[in-house]
């Protein structure tokens, strides 16, 4: 039973002359008598047009308008589909962003709906305006559907018919063959993987808890809950995934690592890296999707400004020296390095890489998977590379003094060396190497460029909306008075059928520091990272924060996203 309609919208319609005051009150009374939402009554009785009413509400109340007919209802997190609340308020929760739950409604004055959902789920709530007829259709589809526990009726058989484990994975033993009892699990996991690939997820999380089993996707760096299948299926999920990854099904006490190669079609496949972790309630399994297309990115797609692009290309063109890319896990370091290797990858150049693991196959590049248990470390691989007549060497990560010293030796003896470190800024990379024990003169003479980076979510071009921010706040964030005087046009996320909560894709934010005479002197003097960063900025280095604010200024991302990935 829906809640009684309130008079807020009726008063606005009367004031706008869309309805007379007497008609507005009469229709409101009739809606109350029939226990129908006011908007539903108006549209069902063809008193107002659904689209015209939605357009009026958008202008009157400033609530973003969403085309619900184009929204994929399958993406709605199941745990928020509270039938009682949906029917009571005639609204539909459609997605979350951070700690905010977005509610689709045709009457933006329905504050009680936002309060009830917020109280029930412990989240902040925001309204999204939708057309009444589309809202009614969507609610009907969701509430009338009779799905089984896994929602198998929604799976398109033709869509996943060619999704299978490739031969190299399935030649294990007879345990790969599934029984009839396992068929629904196989089918469901195939659907989950296909959905992850379609939505551009980088990671899949299969997580068992005491009373719940949760599946999440990491999309554009943010985790989203996708499904909550019955908890009693947890062991069958982990068994199937371990079979696909060629892991020991019986071993549940220790972590395991494996790979899955999925055949998507006759000519296309997808590599996945699998890790299992024993927890209190079963095995948590995380699958990393290794997108080979990421290795073929054009440098224009990375997000450099013109100056940064020129600096990176100039460093890549040098016959020797060291290029270091730094940032936290998931900041896009591998993609930046692979893009650089693709630029260098010609028949005249011998390239060798030591990686842990080899994430993406690069034809024409000699890629080595390090295996410390067998004695093949980054350091030992590097030593071998130097006897292989290399031009370019990439080391997945400089983790210790031994690896750092060999990499520097290579960079000083006619080789171009690329590698990564886990530091927060370009300047901190230099002090990290000094703290490892690398002599200052070796750092100053070998390093040519250090690039710190982050990945920020890009605003969806289809739905981003202008954002008004007080001048004082903009100055505090890092914008200059000159930028404010020139005029800023900032945008914020909204959310539509084309995106995930207002964002779609990611873009790199970079801080590039070149080795200069002044910085080399500071290194020799044992200066700290703050002193080095100050000189680098005087010489023209853009910090991560400044680069991020520029991305917000030109409408690529939002201020909220820059605040999330950078510090002032």
Swiss-Prot record:
Annotated localization: Cytoplasm
Pfam families: MshEN, T2SSE
InterPro entries named in the record: ATPase_typ4_pilus-assembl_PilB, P-loop_NTPase, T2SS/T4SS_dom, T2SS_E_N_sf, T2SS_GspE_N
Listed GO biological process terms: pilus assembly; protein transport
Keyword Protease (UniProt): no
Residues that, per the record, bind ATP: 327-334
Top-level taxonomic group: Bacteria
CDD domains noted in UniProt: PulE-GspE-like
UniProt GO molecular function: ATP binding; ATP hydrolysis activity
One CC-aspect GO term: plasma membrane
Cross-referenced PROSITE patterns: T2SP_E
Keywords annotated in UniProt: ATP-binding, Cytoplasm, Fimbrium biogenesis, Nucleotide-binding, Protein transport, Transport
Keyword Protein transport: yes
Record function comment: Involved in the translocation of the type IV pilin.
Family from the record: Belongs to the GSP E family.
Protein name (Swiss-Prot/TrEMBL): Type IV pilus assembly protein TapB
Organism field: Aeromonas hydrophila
Gene name in the database record: tapB
């Amino acid at each position: 039973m829906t809640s009684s309609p309130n008079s807020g919208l009726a008063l606005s319609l009367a004031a706008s002359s869309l309805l007379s005051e007497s008609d507005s009150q009469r229709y409101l009374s009739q809606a109350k008598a029939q226990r129908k939402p006011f908007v539903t009554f108006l549209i069902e009785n063809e008193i107002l047009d659904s689209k015209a009413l939605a357009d009026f509400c958008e202008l009157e109340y400033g609530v973003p308008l969403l085309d619900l007919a184009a929204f994929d209802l399958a993406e709605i997190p199941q745990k928020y589909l509270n039938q009682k609340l949906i029917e009571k308020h005639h609204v539909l929760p459609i997605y979350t962003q951070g700690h905010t739950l977005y509610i689709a409604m045709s009457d933006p004055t329905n504050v009680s709906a936002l309060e009830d959902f917020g109280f029930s789920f412990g989240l902040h709530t925001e309204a999204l305006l939708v057309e009444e007829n589309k809202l009614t259709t969507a609610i009907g589809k969701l509430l009338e559907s009779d799905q089984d526990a896994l929602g198998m009726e929604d799976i398109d058989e033709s869509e996943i018919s060619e999704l299978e484990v490739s031969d190299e994975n399935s030649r294990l033993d007879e345990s790969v063959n599934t029984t009839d009892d396992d068929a629904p699990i196989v089918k469901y996991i195939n659907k989950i993987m296909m959905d992850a690939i379609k939505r551009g997820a980088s990671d899949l999380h299969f997580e068992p808890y005491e009373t719940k089993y949760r599946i999440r996707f990491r999309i554009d760096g943010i985790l989203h809950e996708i499904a909550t299948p019955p908890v009693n299926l947890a062991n069958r999920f982990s068994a199937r995934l371990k079979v696909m990854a060629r892991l020991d099904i019986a071993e549940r006490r220790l972590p395991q690592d494996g790979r899955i190669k999925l055949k998507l079609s006759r000519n296309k496949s997808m590599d996945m890296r699998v890790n299992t972790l024993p927890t209190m309630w079963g095995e948590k399994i995380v699958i990393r999707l290794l997108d080979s297309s990421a290795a073929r990115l054009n440098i224009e797609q990375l997000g450099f400004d013109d100056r940064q692009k020129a600096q990176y290309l100039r460093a890549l063109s040098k016959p020797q020296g060291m290029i270091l890319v730094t940032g936290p896990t998931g900041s896009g370091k591998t993609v930046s390095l692979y893009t650089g290797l693709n630029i260098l990858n010609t028949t005249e150049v011998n390239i060798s890489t030591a990686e842990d693991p080899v994430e993406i196959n690069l034809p024409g590049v000699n890629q080595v998977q390090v295996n410390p248990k067998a004695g093949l470390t980054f350091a030992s691989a590097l030593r071998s590379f130097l006897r292989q007549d290399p031009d370019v060497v990439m080391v997945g990560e400089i983790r210790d003094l031994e690896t750092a010293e060999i990499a520097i030796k290579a960079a000083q003896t006619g080789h171009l060396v690329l590698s990564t470190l886990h530091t927060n800024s370009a300047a901190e990379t230099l002090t990290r190497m000094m703290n490892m024990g690398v002599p200052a003169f070796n750092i100053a003479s070998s390093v040519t460029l250090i690039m710190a980076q982050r990945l920020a979510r890009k605003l969806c071009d289809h739905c981003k909306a202008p954002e008004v921010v007080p001048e004082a706040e903009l100055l505090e964030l890092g914008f200059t008075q000159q930028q404010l005087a020139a005029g800023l046009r900032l945008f914020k996320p909204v959310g539509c059928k084309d995106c995930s909560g207002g964002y779609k894709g990611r873009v790199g934010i970079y801080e590039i520091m070149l080795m200069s005479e002044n910085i080399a002197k500071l290194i020799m003097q044992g200066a700290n990272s703050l002193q080095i960063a100050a000189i680098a900025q005087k010489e023209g280095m853009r910090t991560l924060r400044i680069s991020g604010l520029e991305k917000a200024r030109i409408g690529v991302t939002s201020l909220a996203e820059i605040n999330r990935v950078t510090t002032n």
